[in-house]
Amino acid sequence: MDTKQQSTSMLEMVTQSINNFEQATQPTILPTSSSPEEVIEHLISCARPIDFDAIANNPDGKKANVIQKTVITIDEFKKIADQNNRNITIIKGEIFIYNGVYWQNLEENEAKYLLGKVAEAMNYDSIDSQFYRTRDRLYNQLHSAAYTPEDSSETKCETVLVNFRNGTLEVNETGAILREHRPEDKLTYCLKYDYDPNAKCDKFYTFLNQMLPDIESQVILFEYLGYTLTKYLKLEKFLLLLGEGKNGKSVIYEIVRKLFGEENVCNLSLEEVTKDKGYCRIDLHNKLLNYGSEIGGR
């Protein structure tokens, strides 16, 4: 084989190797609204072995130390997440992963499990990757690396955003438009149905006219449910539904629970919410609405 043929053959081999590498590292976009478990397993499967010593590139030729390995691992992990459209951020001290529609909360134990498995896939010693201190270091480093200061202009924003399956409804003084989902909206929920401005439910209005015939009261009910979807409007109000038994309160509750999604509603009584040591108030965190079926005896 002459020199020209050898060069051509080598070029073909290199080209094929590059193609194989690109195919192996091609980002895979998960279905939107994937569960945290699905996101975790997918990100673990995307992790590949890396040479920590080469990346650290210590001038004395020493191996990468613990600090360097921790920083490198999280940097590489964030690259994997970004390449697979799974942006990671810190919102009010908690880790969230964007799934293409909204930001899903990743609990501490889930995050530490994920980071330990990713570290093992990146060439950590198997025992070291399972050690709680290793996972604690990675978890704390992710908090530091993924943190971005909140935009102070957000607190002055008067635009209302409501997240639906088919887009985000943007409401302001000029009107309302349905647009694409955007990670910068920082929405942490998605209502499980499409927005349809022409949708009607005659059966519901028939029920409402029977159980709550006063039109002004109907408007107040609708206004309050809409208020719960606003982020910046601080009315600091709660709504009481008064009445004897079998007057439709439980039907309203079931409708609201389905409307907002069970994962976005909690059910603390007024007594539980107002206790001096209200430890249960932690359940209000990341919820759109608290709907207490009973006031309580306090």
Labelled PLM ranges:
Residues 288-298:
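Conserved AAA+/SF3 P-loop NTPase catalytic/coupling segment centered on the Walker-B
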Residues 54-57, 61-113, 117-127:
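Noncatalytic partner-interaction/assembly domains of nucleic-acid and motor enzyme complexes
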Residues 1-84, 197, 201-206, 210:
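Replication-associated primase and helicase/ATPase modules
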Residues 75-79, 143-144, 226-227:
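Short, hydrophobic/amphipathic alpha-helical patches that form generic packing surfaces
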Residues 123-134, 215:
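Short, surface-exposed acidic
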Residues 117-118, 124-126, 198-199, 268, ...:
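Short, surface-exposed, polar/charged, turn-prone segments marking secondary-structure boundaries
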Residues 4-21, 35, 84-109, 113, ...:
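P-loop NTPase catalytic core of nucleic-acid-dependent motor ATPases
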Residues 61-74, 129-169:
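Extended, Lys/Arg-enriched charged tracts that mediate electrostatic binding to polyanionic substrates
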